[in-house]
Amino acid sequence: MDTVSLTGKELAAALNADTKQRAEALTAGGVAARLALIVANDDPASAWYVNSLRKAAERLGIACERIDLGADATADGIRAELRERSADPAFDAIMLQTPLPASVALDDVSSAIAADKDVDGVSPLSLGLLAAGLAGFVPATAQAVVELLKHHEIALSGRHVAVVGRSNVVGKPLAQLLLAENATVTVCHSRTTDLAAITSTADVVVAAVGRAGLVTGDHVRAGAVVVDVGTNEAEDGGIVGDVDAESVRGKAAGLSPVPGGVGPVTTALLMRHVVEAAERHRG
């Protein structure tokens, strides 16, 4: 079987073109959309990602300010910074970059982000709005998975989707988004017994657990679609996903590549959220 590569390049380009046009309209009105990137780590991979976000914002006409709190930042210090930026009308959007210091849990500080500026949908309020089916910003990676599947015309209504991973930033919100598309969703995790017995019955398998090569050809039925959300550092310094692509390719009908699949769409959606926040603030 020929496995179609579910790339995100075309979708990301279309999203970015629309975002750029809207950002330029805001700038023409006198005030550019502005994002605060809050960083509390010295992680090289995080630094690379933050730099890529800043470059993406610059290309699209979005002002982006990196605010470094240091790897020794406390929960109180992070919350104070988030509250200050939430109250500052100069900023339309806030993104708290992970990882956080070992002593700080995302759930303990994210509630300090104002919902109207929480463009990555990580606060308890944003996640609650999503669970209730109400308007709010959605975690961009979870949204990117759904948008990528739609872009490649993968049907979701009535289909069985197995989501491997239950984090608050991908797995859980993705399950909510898939339910809204009328999919039948099974969420698997580290305590799931016989993972392959579940995933091999699914029409779509989404791997979002952060373990390189966890999902293999044995986990996938012939003709299924596989979306790889993982970004793990390989021994050679490159990036690999949560899916063993070689064993899945030729068995799955479609497979998103790493890199080049979900990632570009996630960044594009984050930038679109920033502009949407700015548009709402401008009335």
Swiss-Prot record:
Which proteins does it associate with, and in what oligomeric form?
A: Homodimer.
Annotated metabolic or biological route of this protein: One-carbon metabolism; tetrahydrofolate interconversion
Q: Pfam families given for it? A: THF_DHG_CYH, THF_DHG_CYH_C
- Keyword Ribosomal protein attached: no
| Matching InterPro entries | Aminoacid_DH-like_N_sf (IPR046346), NAD(P)-bd_dom_sf (IPR036291), THF_DH/CycHdrlase (IPR000672), THF_DH/CycHdrlase_cat_dom (IPR020630), THF_DH/CycHdrlase_NAD-bd_dom (IPR020631)
Residue sites binding NADP(+) per the record: G165, R166, S167, S190, T231
Q: Which Gene3D superfamilies match?
A: Leucine Dehydrogenase, chain A, domain 1, NAD(P)-binding Rossmann-like Domain
Native species of this protein? Nocardia farcinica (strain IFM 10152)
- GO:BP terms for this protein? L-histidine biosynthetic process; methionine biosynthetic process; purine nucleotide biosynthetic process; tetrahydrofolate interconversion
What is this protein's record name? Bifunctional protein FolD
Q: Which GO molecular function annotation, any one, does this entry have?
A: methenyltetrahydrofolate cyclohydrolase activity
Keywords, comma-separated and alphabetical: Amino-acid biosynthesis, Histidine biosynthesis, Hydrolase, Methionine biosynthesis, Multifunctional enzyme, NADP, One-carbon metabolism, Oxidoreductase, Purine biosynthesis
- Taxonomically, which superkingdom? Bacteria
Q: Which SUPFAM superfamilies match?
A: Aminoacid dehydrogenase-like, N-terminal domain, NAD(P)-binding Rossmann-fold domains
Catalysed reaction equations from the record: (6R)-5,10-methylene-5,6,7,8-tetrahydrofolate + NADP(+) = (6R)-5,10-methenyltetrahydrofolate + NADPH; (6R)-5,10-methenyltetrahydrofolate + H2O = (6R)-10-formyltetrahydrofolate + H(+)
